[in-house]
């Protein structure tokens, strides 16, 4: 009843404005109407892309079928698998095309590395409403940009609008089990040279099972000072506070008694953690007035993470054990990049990047174990000072593109050297149709990452041993209106042993006036991954009511055959793979209805239509379950305001 009341109030509040939107001046095909105007003439219009030739996704890729976080957004795209650990949990995004057992992607935000420093990144620190674009760096070239990056990099490009008027955006989502999510985004222009961006979000969840509630607050602000067309300053402040109960999954992981949550007994009823994450960054961009082909980009950042983990704290029985840990990590970083843009002619250009990273990372971990009258405590302090130099070259001539790069780093006393090269050639048939051939290879020399999964572990890793490995891929893309097709083959070699030799990824689709379809099929030869993943999204779209409603409705399907997903340990934040894990398959079908009218996007999702019991982590089922009566999983609205 409470959820229905909130929905009615929202619709009542918004409906007069919806009906009042009679102008066709707005582009209804644009899902996010807050766009940058010519007002910001002093801004250096160089984005936060790590590489100007990267593939990017924008809000149109996730606003229509109502994705709640970064993991759900990427799970729709080829190449990604998520290990779900409950609503608001530390869900991990894996690179399905990686040859490494440690396959978690590396996350950057506006060009700054966030993951791999404190060994994990909680995706709940990011709001969907703050994301403008998502940059994907290829597996071939990703390691050139960050410390210990052995898989694909995802770079979140946050919204950075600069408009001559006060503007705001509200995103509200309502989910099952009293899950409510709201996020506000504001733009305050103070002058043609100064503006302030502000965001505030809250996410609350009562939980489908015992001890599964969570509460999350996010706050972010950004101050832009455009001193001149040659010098820009940007200051970011982000803070996230997350409290969540940790039930460690369900005991009856393969039983269908989840139709009634009463019979779904959780592993733990007295376990929780509290997380505080603070991020500060000062960005300086400089283009010398006399040298427009140069761009200097400097970031001074600090990340402060504190976690409290509590087991047995509320249990008053004398013969029960208790375990408390605190983890505190601070990352001070200096990043400097120098870009050289050389345009030889209209069809020939060269871009060169030279950069350096230096970080100082103190970490403190304390723990207390109590059983009866015995108390065991420990304190661990450590410090890391990784340093790296790197460079990348991009060259384009007509339809041929070439890229190469090298990175040397010292981390924890280990020296690593990485290099890569990739190229592509596009044969254009006409303005819209083409055939593209691409290939790439990279090499790691004396890499300091153990082959086995330790990225999300807080415990000491095994001592690394020097070795050489490489990753190479080749593929072809075809676009012939209205269809497109892509086929990619890739191999992974470690010390001469091919352990990922027969993997491939293919995607295809069609785009017509009223119907679109996207399909992908990928294989893996690694035992801890499914043999293959099939994904599809088929939808109908049209402009209705005299072009005032941009309407879309479709089906979203995912299937993975029987496999043994990993177990998750919330104490050490570790994923482990075992032959004893239950073997399951995954099948999910969602139906969604969405539309944009005036300044608002509205979406409804009917989730898991076949009521399938799905897992991507061995004992954590997806919460989108409950039969036909509970099929309407989510409602969301994204509303733009202009004052």
Go through each PLM region and give its residues:
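Extracytoplasmic beta-strand/coil segments of soluble accessory domains associated
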Residues: 29-46, 71-113
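Flexible loop and strand-edge segments within Gram-negative outer membrane beta-barrel domains
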Residues: 232-288, 305-330, 382, 442
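A beta-strand signature from Gram-negative outer-membrane beta-barrel systems
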Residues: 125-171
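Coil residues (strongly favoring Ser/Thr
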Residues: 26-27, 32-33, 41, 53-56, ...
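Periplasmic plug
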Residues: 46-54, 93-140
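Transmembrane beta-barrel wall of Gram-negative outer-membrane proteins
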Residues: 180-204, 210-244, 273-282
């Amino acid at each position: 009843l409470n959820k229905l009341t909130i929905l009615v109030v929202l619709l009542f509040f918004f409906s007069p404005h919806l009906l009042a939107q009679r102008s066709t001046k707005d582009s209804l095909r644009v899902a996010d109407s807050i766009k940058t105007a010519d007002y910001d003439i002093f801004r250096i219009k160089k984005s936060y892309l790590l590489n100007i030739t990267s593939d990017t996704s924008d809000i149109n890729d996730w606003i229509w079928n109502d994705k709640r976080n970064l993991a759900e957004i990427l799970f729709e795209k080829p190449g990604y698998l998520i290990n779900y650990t409950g609503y608001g949990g530390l869900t991990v995004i894996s690179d399905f095309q990686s040859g490494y057992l440690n396959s978690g992607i590396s996350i950057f935000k506006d060009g700054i590395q966030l993951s791999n420093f404190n060994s994990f990144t909680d995706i709940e620190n990011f709001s969907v409403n703050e994301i403008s674009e998502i940059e994907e760096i290829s597996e071939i070239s990703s390691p050139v940009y960050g410390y210990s990056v052995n898989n694909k990099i995802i770079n979140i490009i946050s919204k950075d609008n600069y408009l001559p008027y006060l503007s705001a955006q509200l995103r509200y989502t309502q989910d099952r089990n009293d899950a409510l999510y709201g996020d506000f985004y504001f733009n305050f222009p103070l002058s043609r040279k100064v503006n302030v961006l502000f965001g505030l979000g809250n996410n609350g969840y009562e939980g489908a099972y015992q001890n599964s509630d969570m509460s999350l607050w996010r706050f972010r602000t950004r101050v832009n000072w455009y001193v001149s067309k040659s010098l820009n300053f940007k200051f970011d402040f982000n803070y996230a506070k997350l409290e969540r109960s940790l039930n460690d999954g369900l005991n009856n992981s393969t039983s269908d008694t989840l139709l009634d949550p009463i019979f779904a007994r959780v592993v733990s009823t007295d376990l929780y953690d509290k997380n505080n994450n603070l991020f500060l960054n000062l960005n300086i961009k400089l283009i010398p007035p006399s040298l427009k082909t140069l761009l200097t980009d400097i970031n001074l950042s600090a990340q402060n993470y504190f976690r409290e983990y509590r087991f047995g704290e509320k249990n008053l029985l004398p013969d029960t054990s208790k375990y408390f840990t605190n983890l505190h990590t601070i990352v001070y970083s200096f990043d400097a990049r120098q870009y050289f843009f050389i345009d030889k002619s209209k069809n020939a250009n060269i871009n060169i990047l030279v950069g350096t990273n230096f970080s100082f990372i103190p970490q403190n971990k304390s723990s207390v174990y109590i059983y009866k009258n015995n108390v065991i405590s420990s304190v661990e302090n450590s410090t890391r000072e990784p340093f790296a130099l790197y460079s990348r070259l991009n060259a384009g001539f007509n339809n041929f593109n070439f890229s190469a790069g090298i990175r040397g780093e010292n981390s924890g006393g280990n020296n690593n050297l990485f290099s890569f090269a990739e190229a592509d050639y596009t044969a254009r048939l006409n303005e819209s149709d083409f055939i593209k051939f691409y290939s790439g290879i990279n090499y790691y020399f004396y890499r300091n990452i153990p082959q086995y999964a330790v990225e999300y572990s807080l415990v000491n890793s095994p001592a690394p041993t020097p070795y050489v490995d490489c990753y190479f891929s080749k593929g072809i893309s075809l676009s012939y209106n209205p269809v497109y097709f892509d086929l990619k083959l890739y191999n992974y070699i470690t010390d001469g042993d091919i352990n990922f030799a027969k993997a491939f990824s293919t995607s295809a689709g069609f785009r017509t006036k009223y119907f679109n379809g996207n399909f992908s099929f990928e294989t893996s030869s690694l035992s801890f991954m499914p043999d293959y993943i099939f994904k599809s999204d088929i939808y109908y779209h049209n402009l209705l009511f005299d072009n005032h409603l941009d309407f879309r409705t479709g089906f979203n399907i995912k299937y993975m055959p029987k496999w043994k997903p990993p177990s998750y340990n919330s104490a050490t934040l570790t994923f482990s793979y075992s032959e004893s894990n239950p073997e399951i398959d995954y099948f999910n079908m969602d139906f969604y209805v969405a539309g944009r009218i005036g300044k608002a996007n509205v979406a409804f999702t009917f989730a898991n239509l076949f009521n399938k019991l799905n897992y991507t982590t061995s004992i954590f089922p997806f919460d989108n379950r409950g039969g036909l009566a509970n099929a309407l999983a989510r409602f969301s609205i994204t509303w733009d305001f202009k004052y």
